[in-house]
């Protein structure tokens, strides 16, 4: 069972695996999951990149995210700044850096002649995902799986399917108004409907307030060590 204690215990291992600060409970739970899978199989297939290329994320659908002139998965920088002191915040200026990186990516997004404004925006969101969000998730999957000795293969990241789907019209990707409808339709007759048409379930993270309490205690322990980074 992946409980709060397991996620805290594996958080240290997840940071080692990433060699950087990681995505906290989401990453430690994945590391724990990989450690269980590798006991039965040394190679596995994962679903990374399906949401990026088939348009499964909320920012493809929610108007607030869709129209935001910033990375849609980082619309609020405040939680990311809470652990930084004021001097660092002033020197780094996270909002300015993010806006610059966002605009640079938007400017280099390939355009398709004849697209209306909404379709052009969907193309921009797709490109933002491919350039930034997908890279983060791929790196996470690679590092957490290999840390456990598990080889994770990502068929949806095959450049041929990525290139093909980049130009598939939205009404096909969202076939019959269903999120990732094209992907679901492709699986008909192969997978049962209860699997094909179930609601998206984000990778396990916890909303248990006890996790936050345990994590806070661990952070205080680190901060109490003068030699801690």
Predicted regions located by residue number:
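PAPS-dependent sulfotransferase catalytic core
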Residues: 191-229
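A short, ordered amphipathic alpha-helix with a cationic face
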Residues: 133-138, 151, 228-229
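Short hydrophobic-aromatic micro-motifs
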Residues: 44-46, 128, 134, 163, ...
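Generic structural signal for residues positioned in beta-strands
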Residues: 71-72, 133, 202
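Short Ser/Thr-interspersed hydrophobic loop/turn segments at strand-loop and sheet-helix junctions
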Residues: 130-143, 165
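ATP-dependent adenylate-handling active sites, centered on carboxylate activation for C-N bond formation
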Residues: 1-110, 114, 118-125, 143-190, ...
């Amino acid at each position: 069972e992946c409980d709060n204690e397991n996620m805290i215990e594996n958080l240290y291992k997840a940071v080692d695996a990433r060699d950087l600060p990681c995505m906290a409970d989401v990453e430690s739970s994945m590391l724990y999951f990989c450690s269980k899978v590798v006991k039965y199989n040394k190679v596995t297939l994962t679903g990374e990149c399906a949401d990026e290329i088939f348009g499964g994320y909320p920012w493809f659908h929610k108007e607030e995210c869709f129209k935001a002139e910033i990375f849609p998965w980082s619309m609020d920088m405040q939680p990311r700044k809470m652990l930084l002191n004021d001097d660092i915040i002033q020197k780094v200026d996270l909002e300015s850096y993010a806006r610059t990186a966002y605009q640079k990516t938007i400017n280099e997004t390939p355009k398709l002649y004849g697209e209306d404004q909404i379709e052009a925006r969907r193309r921009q969101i797709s490109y933002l995902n491919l350039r930034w969000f997908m890279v983060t998730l791929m790196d996470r999957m690679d590092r957490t799986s290999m840390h456990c000795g598990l080889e994770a293969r990502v068929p949806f990241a095959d450049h041929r399917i990525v290139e093909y789907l980049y130009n598939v019209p939205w009404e096909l990707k969202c076939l019959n108004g269903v999120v990732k409808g094209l992907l679901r339709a492709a699986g008909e007759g192969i997978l049962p409907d209860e699997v094909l048409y179930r609601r998206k379930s984000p990778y396990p993270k916890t909303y248990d307030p006890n996790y936050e309490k345990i994590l806070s205690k661990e952070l205080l322990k680190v901060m109490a060590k003068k030699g801690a980074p």
